[in-house]
Regions:
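Alpha-helical recognition/docking segments in bacterial nutrient-uptake
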Residues: 1, 65, 71-166
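N-terminal helix-turn-helix DNA-binding module of bacterial transcription factors
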Residues: 1-61, 321
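Short beta-strand segments enriched in small/hydrophobic residues
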Residues: 17-22, 56-69, 167, 175-181
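Hinge/beta->alpha junction and helix N-cap segments in small-molecule ligand-binding domains
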Residues: 50, 68-77, 95-104, 153-163, ...
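Periplasmic-binding protein-like
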Residues: 116-123, 175-180, 206, 226-235, ...
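Flexible loop/turn connectors
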Residues: 225-322
């Protein structure tokens, strides 16, 4: 099949090639000319060559997305939100997985920053100082991380924690084991701070574990060695590991122990029992972040978006045992 060229569109529309280029890239042409060129381009099935368009506009039409672990369904959902929104606005996305390594995050930021129009960065581990030194605030948006001076999209972590604590309190729980994430993780610090501010409960922090299913398996034994009647996990993968370990040791959930996760990934509804979890708008965060990056939102000068969270109650949380 012969590919339609910009010259074909120009001939059919009765205009010059440069006029077609301006019409298709937002340049200065009359509304009537733009409409006529777009109609012809659509009728002929013309697909602009992104590289050639970049020579005209100085932009690549591509964006970068950096995530710490694509095996975690949380970040897979974020990526879905980014790519779906990018497709809707005719952009491509290069995705890099940094394997929870802050050095790799900064290296990927440098590489993608040179080769794309902007970068969406999920960076749980890199320090604020390193991010401020490496990231261009005009072409970088942080996802699920806040660093003063850089645009960001974050979830209302404190609000989600408060909902989870209210839920467990209403069920009679006063001794709650918190299986925290990595100590250098921004999200882990935010969640622990929100829990510590909750008051009226005995918080039993269990830290130093990986934010993974295997980390949750190890946490299950620590929970059973504590006086806790409920567990709040750093994320759903950890919570699912806890559930698995409790089941292996004959502990019935929620009759003997309640378990609450954070993120509400798709696996949460498939566990046994289904996992109560704080829902974070993962794909929406990706879409909002992309809009911030492309300047499509009319956001405040701080360029920060805070997205609401909500507790999804399922069968893993119940009344505290006497």
């Amino acid at each position: 099949m012969v590919r339609t060229t910009v010259q074909d569109v120009a001939r059919a529309a009765g205009v010059s090639v440069s006029t077609v280029s301006r019409a298709l890239t937002g340049g200065i042409v009359s509304p009537a000319t733009r409409e006529a060129v777009l109609e012809v381009a659509t009728r002929l099935g013309y697909q602009p060559n992104r590289a050639a368009r970049g020579l005209i506009t100085g932009r690549t039409g591509n964006l970068g997305l950096i995530v710490p672990d694509l095996r975690n369904p949380f970040f897979a959902d974020v990526a879905k939100g980014v790519t779906a929104r990018a497709r809707a606005v005719d952009h491509g996305v290069f995705i890099t997985d940094t394997d929870e390594d802050p050095v790799a995050e900064l290296e990927a930021l440098a590489t993608l920053g040179r080769n794309t129009d902007g970068v969406l960065l999920c960076s749980p581990r890199a320090s604020d100082a390193d991010l401020l030194a490496a990231a261009d605030p005009e072409s970088t948006v942080l996802l699920h991380r806040r660093v003063p001076g850089l645009p960001s999209v974050v979830a209302d972590i404190a609000g989600g924690i408060r909902q989870a604590v209210r839920h467990l309190r209403a069920l009679g729980h006063r001794r709650i084991a918190y299986v925290s994430g990595p100590e250098d993780s921004w999200a882990a610090q935010q969640r622990l701070a929100a829990l510590s501010a909750a008051g009226d409960l005995e918080l039993l922090p269990l830290g130093g574990l990986a934010p993974t299913f295997d980390g949750g398996l190890l946490a299950g034994d620590l929970v059973l060695d504590s006086p806790a009647t409920a567990v709040l996990a750093y994320n759903d993968l950890v919570a699912l590991g806890v559930l698995h370990r409790l089941a292996a040791r004959g502990v019935v959930v929620p009759e003997r122990m309640s378990v609450v996760g954070f993120d509400d990934v798709s696996l949460a509804a498939m566990s046994h029992p289904p996992l109560t979890s704080v829902a974070v708008p993962k794909d929406r965060a990706g879409a909002v972040g992309l809009d911030l990056l492309l300047g499509r939102t009319g956001a405040t000068t701080e360029r920060e978006a805070v997205l609401p969270t909500g507790l999804v109650v399922r069968a893993s949380s119940g009344v505290a045992r006497p």
